[in-house]
Amino acid sequence: MSDTSILAYCRPGYENDTANELTSRYGEAGFYGYPVSKKNSGFAHYHLYDAAQLEQTVTQFAVHDSIFPRQLVAVFAAINDVEKEDRVGQVLDALKEVEKPFSIFGAVDVEYPDTEEGKTLAKFCRKFTVPLRQALRKAGWLTAKENLGKPKLHIFFASFEICYIGFTLPSHASRDHLGICRLKFPSDSPSRSTLKLEDALVNMLSNKQQSKVLRSGGRAVDLGACPGGWTYQLVKRGMYVEAIDNGLIADSLMSTGLVEHHAADGFTYRPQFGRVDLLVCDMIEQPDRVAKLMGDWLVKHWATHAIFNIKLPMKRRYETVVEAMTSLNSRLDALDDAFAVKVRHLYHDRDEVTVTIVRTSKDEV
């Protein structure tokens, strides 16, 4: 059957926050609809009133420019009573009933929610992909060879009985299956929190920005550094780090000669040489306090760039992020410099979002 909506994959428990973000951002852009979400389902829908706006809506902003969605899929068909006997045939029949959004797709992903229930679908989805891909190619829906430069077809099984059919565009979608970038924990890191910063560096900064922000020989400050998970990522890239925490920093980091440990309050500490290239912060504090502190460092040029986490409350999480970032952005907008700002709820984040702020000149924007 026909279904016109934006399907957003998200962390379980964040469905309502994801729905609030979609409603706010699409509504402000004039793409009107209504959200549907179920707690702990791992996804949310934004149903459009005007089906003709589907492609225009999904290109309104890329998934990496959103906060809570891991993937944004433009859904144009759904099957609410999938039968075991001929699932491939049912998908093909559903596609025959709708207008083809593109002449051909370059790839297909068969996906499922990132939940305990979703994991029971994982094996089936992997096995189902091969015969489905073959049938789609035979029916003229897929290129003979995978072409990731073309739109991708997504078959999302919410359960064994319900699946949604949609597409993503390569310029606006996550490249990762389920929208999840899985990273391997480095055995020599003192803390699993290191994956949060690595996730941000890999997925929120372009290669050019990484070279600019993480230059070997540069200086950084890590507020709330103990035991050194974030410092580890900076040292690994050859940066000198002022690690600020009343707790101890791992001996393995101190022995590199790149780390200075200062037992001090993160809110009152100032850089040893007046400024640093990068400020990072994963302190457990109120969102508005962290946003103000980060603003102070950037406005007063104590730091050129910043990467930090904002811890989230149990309720009004989207609104909390917007309020904190609106306040911070207003301070940055008053400066002569320009800033590339991103806010993401990364896979390795829990009840927090990660913010990257890269300073540029006005001419670079």
From Swiss-Prot:
Belongs to the class I-like SAM-binding methyltransferase superfamily. RNA methyltransferase RlmE family. RlmM subfamily. It is found in: Cytoplasm. One of its GO terms (cellular component) is cytoplasm. S-adenosyl-L-methionine binds at S193, C226, P227, G228, G229, D245, D265, D282. The active site is at K311 (proton acceptor). Catalyzes the 2'-O-methylation at nucleotide C2498 in 23S rRNA. PANTHER family: RIBOSOMAL RNA LARGE SUBUNIT METHYLTRANSFERASE M (PTHR37524), RIBOSOMAL RNA METHYLTRANSFERASE FTSJ DOMAIN-CONTAINING PROTEIN (PTHR37524:SF2). One of its GO terms (molecular function) is S-adenosylmethionine-dependent methyltransferase activity. Its main location: cytoplasm. GO terms for biological process: methylation; rRNA processing. Monomer. InterPro entries: RlmM_FDX, RlmM_THUMP-like, RNA_MeTrfase_FtsJ_dom, rRNA_MeTrfase_M, SAM-dependent_MTases_sf. This is Ribosomal RNA large subunit methyltransferase M. It is an enzyme of class 2 (transferase). It holds the Pfam family RlmM_FDX. Keywords: Cytoplasm, Methyltransferase, rRNA processing, S-adenosyl-L-methionine, Transferase. It catalyses: cytidine(2498) in 23S rRNA + S-adenosyl-L-methionine = 2'-O-methylcytidine(2498) in 23S rRNA + S-adenosyl-L-homocysteine + H(+). Its EC number is 2.1.1.186. It comes from Alteromonas mediterranea (strain DSM 17117 / CIP 110805 / LMG 28347 / Deep ecotype).
